[in-house]
Curated annotation (Swiss-Prot):
Residues found modified as O-(5'-phospho-DNA)-tyrosine: Y194
Originating species: Bacillus phage Bam35c (Bacillus thuringiensis bacteriophage Bam35c)
Stated name of the protein: DNA terminal protein
Signal peptide: none
Effect seen on changing Y202F: No effect on DNA priming capacity
Keywords for the protein's UniProt record, in alphabetical order: Covalent protein-DNA linkage, DNA replication, Nucleotide-binding, Phosphoprotein, Viral DNA replication, Virion
Oligomer status and interactors: Interacts with the DNA-binding protein P1.
GO BP terms, alphabetized: DNA replication; viral DNA genome replication
Length: 245
């Protein structure tokens, strides 16, 4: 019984404390008892909850660059945020790399087989191969050229179709975040382009494109690829270490 009285006393104290925080004087709260206290407390608690919700909605609206007065309820705000997210996703920049062989000897199957082969090779092996091609005066295998483009996600499909219709094979599609896939694309360029100056040009263009993307991972990969381009001595332990990527 004593515990019940203590619990009730503490609950009354908590309610009166809230009323004081809502602007009631201690003198006024002392006069409130029983049902009257409960009625006033519920009203003030409800008002506080509404204010907190309104503040939360307003803060989130501001974070998304929206007007708090216009989007003043979850029902209005959340669908608008979802719409913005979808629009941002459609506008997200994508990096596309295409290759065309002048002789017509390479096709999509060649690229597929090349990528498949690299799935069984370590990064250090692929990197060593790239450095070897960079140091080789001429490639006696293929005569080709490369196109590197950045487009919004909504345009990826039609851009792929456009370049395919011009005889190009896609060798990379993504946001520049996957270093292994980028290395495979680079090695494809090394194998597929005859002149070393042209290979240098494409690699420098790729690094610049990666740096321009709004993704930290892409910028980090640009630095790693630049290191490959600049390196004079190849260290297997370095390129195999996942901490670098």
């Amino acid at each position: 019984m004593a515990n019940k009285r203590l619990k009730k006393k503490l609950e009354t104290k908590r309610k009166k404390s809230l009323l004081v925080s809502e602007g009631y004087s201690k003198k006024e709260t002392k006069k409130l008892k029983g049902r009257e206290l409960e009625t006033v407390y519920k009203k003030k608690a409800h008002n506080r909850k509404n204010r907190e919700r309104a503040r939360e909605i307003a803060n989130l609206a501001k974070q998304w660059g929206l007007s708090p007065s216009k989007y003043n309820s979850w029902k209005k705000l959340l669908p608008e945020i979802e719409r913005i997210k979808k629009e941002q996703d459609r506008e997200a920049p994508f990096l596309l790399i295409y290759y065309q062989d002048f002789t017509g000897e390479t096709d999509s199957k060649f690229i597929y087989d090349f990528k498949k082969r690299n799935n069984t090779r370590s990064r250090s092996q692929i990197t060593e191969s790239i450095i070897g091609w960079l140091q080789n005066a001429h490639n006696k295998l293929f005569l080709g050229r490369v196109a590197i483009r950045i487009v919004p996600k909504r345009d990826v499909s039609k851009t792929n179709t456009l370049w395919r219709n011009h005889g190009y094979v896609k060798i990379y599609e993504g946001q520049g975040k996957e270093l292994s896939k980028l290395l495979t694309a680079i090695e494809t360029i090394m194998v597929g382009v005859y002149d070393v100056k042209e290979r240098d040009k494409y690699l420098k263009e790729l690094v610049a494109k990666l740096r321009s993307l709004p993704y930290e991972k892409a910028k980090k990969n640009a630095k790693e690829i630049q290191k490959i381009y600049d390196t004079k001595s190849y260290k297997k332990e370095s390129w195999d270490n996942d901490d670098y990527y």
